[in-house]
Regions:
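Conserved Rossmann-like nucleotide-cofactor binding loop
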Residues: 11, 15, 36, 140
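Conserved N-terminal helical subregion
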Residues: 48-164
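Conserved FAD-binding catalytic core of PHBH/FMO-like flavoproteins
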Residues: 105, 129-255, 259, 264
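Conserved N-terminal glycine-rich FAD pyrophosphate-binding loop of Rossmann-like flavoproteins
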Residues: 35-53
């Protein structure tokens, strides 16, 4: 059997690993348009339950992930000058780039062919040459858009705006939520450690607050400076950082919820 996987993110790579573990004779290729180390996010979060599932599926890659994550058991909430803490919530954070490298190495060990810096084109281009074409091309999937009449996606764009940043400030004792009331309304942050030096720092606010600050008209640098000022009491003079310089403008986006009525078409 020959399988082409369009998209070399964590989902595409882990699918390739899983199919090779189940059917080692399968010919699997993963095609990715970016370079191996390219990534435009910071850390990702995995729960204890997810880690257990990864362990059951592939103990080797699971162990590599475990040896590279930051773990916490608490959730801390900062609101109106008070700090509330809740314990018993097992989660870990791992750098997205580190996760990609681990999965790439494991996929190669199992015989998966990885093809980087290659524009995929249409999923239909692979239908005749491969038994199965897996569309792992992300949230803004071109495949889903191309076959929208068949997959019938239902996309609900959520109401709040957010920007995904990083910082050298330590948040290694808890998954941290910070709520700050500003002259334009509430702004909040989700912060968590994902390696020994760096934490994810997601800033979020309502559309009204976003508009009042004029974030849509600011450059990324200007936008980050505003966020640093809002959360300065929690950053200890550490900067907020972006790795989304490939995006024009402020890099704020909304969370979409995507559900498809149908998830396959022919051999895609």
């Amino acid at each position: 059997m020959k399988i082409a996987c369009i998209g070399g993110g964590p989902g595409g790579l882990y699918f390739a690993i899983s199919i090779k573990l189940q059917k080692p004779s399968t010919d699997v290729i993963v095609i990715e348009r970016n370079k191996p180390a390219d990534t435009f996010g910071w850390g990702v979060v995995l729960s204890d339950e997810t880690l257990d599932n990864l362990e059951k599926n592939d103990s080797i890659s699971a162990e590599s992930i475990r040896s590279n994550f930051a773990y916490w058991d608490d959730i801390a909430l900062h609101h109106k000058g008070k700090k509330l803490k809740s314990t018993g919530h097992g989660f870990c954070g791992i750098g997205r780039k580190t996760l990609l490298v681990i999965l790439q190495e494991r996929a190669r060990e199992l015989g998966v062919q990885l093809k980087f810096e290659s524009e995929v084109g249409s999923a239909s281009d692979y239908m005749n040459d491969y038994d199965i074409v897996v569309a792992a091309d992300g949230l803004n999937s071109k495949t889903r858009s191309e076959y929208a009449e068949i997959f019938k996606p239902d996309t609900d764009l959520r109401k709040c705006q957010f920007v995904w940043l990083g910082t050298k400030q330590k948040f290694d004792d808890a998954f941290t939520f910070i709520f700050e009331k500003t002259k334009h309304g509430w702004v909040w942050a989700h912060a968590y450690q994902f390696d020994s030096d760096t934490a994810t720092f997601i800033v979020e606010c309502s559309q009204d607050t976003f508009d009042a600050f004029g974030f849509n008209n600011l450059t990324q640098t200007e936008s980050i400076n505003v966020c640093q000022d809002i959360f300065k009491n929690y950053l200890d003079d550490n900067k907020l950082m972006t790795n989304a310089n490939h995006i024009r403008g402020s890099a704020w986006i909304k969370f979409p919820r995507v559900i498809c009525e149908k998830w396959s078409h022919k051999n895609i």
